[in-house]
Amino acid sequence: KVAINTAAIKDPNFINKASRAFGSSTIVVAIEAIKQSDNSYLAYTDNGREHTGIDAISWARQAEERGAGEILLTSIDKEGTGDGFDTELIKKISNVVTIPVIGHGGAANESHISDSIKDSGADAVAIASMLHYGALNRNGSLVSDYNTEGNTEFLKKKGSYKMFGKENISESPETLNILHERNYSGYTHEFVTHQWARNRG
């Protein structure tokens, strides 16, 4: 499977072409949404940096109509905070599409994951900071002081993405770890995370 966001928004017909060429089941449209002051949600591109002015709910519906097989839905507001998923956003998208919706952004513990699936209608969830910043130890149990880890602390320190050096796979001593998610509604999702050297430099 491949996930597409910026390319699809720049050329929505790309979804049609890709789904015809490879099948809908292989095409995941990633939507990065930010909540607005009027409680609407707009879609963003380039890792949540570029404003598009496109309504996220309408875009999800259009993505399905064009042949997307799944929606990977990221709440930029929640991502890296550890405050839990944006269940309102997930619910709004789930209510207008029939394809699976994968919720992403905000998970800090097992309750956030189970509550999101139970309360929002998500078919699956994706987790990132919980794993990237050591919220899970090696035997899979949760570390209690998650709030001192990862993006939350990074943002408090006024961190900038410019602080990160350029990386490529050949420079990383560890490459791919595959997390096989539970099977929901007959769909099996595999989320692949790149695990970079944590103490590099």
What kind of feature is each model-predicted range?
Residues 9-11, 36, 109, 132-135:
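Short gly/pro/ser/thr-enriched loop/turn and capping motifs at secondary-structure boundaries
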Residues 12, 53-57, 83-92, 141:
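Charged helix-capping and loop-helix junction motifs
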Residues 62-70, 96-99, 171-182:
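A structural motif corresponding to the C-terminal end of an alpha-helix
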Residues 29, 63, 71, 93, ...:
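Conserved, mostly hydrophobic/aromatic
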Residues 1-73, 77-78:
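Conserved anion-binding
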Residues 8, 62, 77-97, 101, ...:
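PLP-dependent amino-acid enzyme catalytic core
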Residues 1, 13-16, 88-127:
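Catalytic cores of alpha/beta
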Residues 15-22, 114-194:
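C-terminal helical cap(s) of enzyme catalytic domains, especially alpha/beta-barrels
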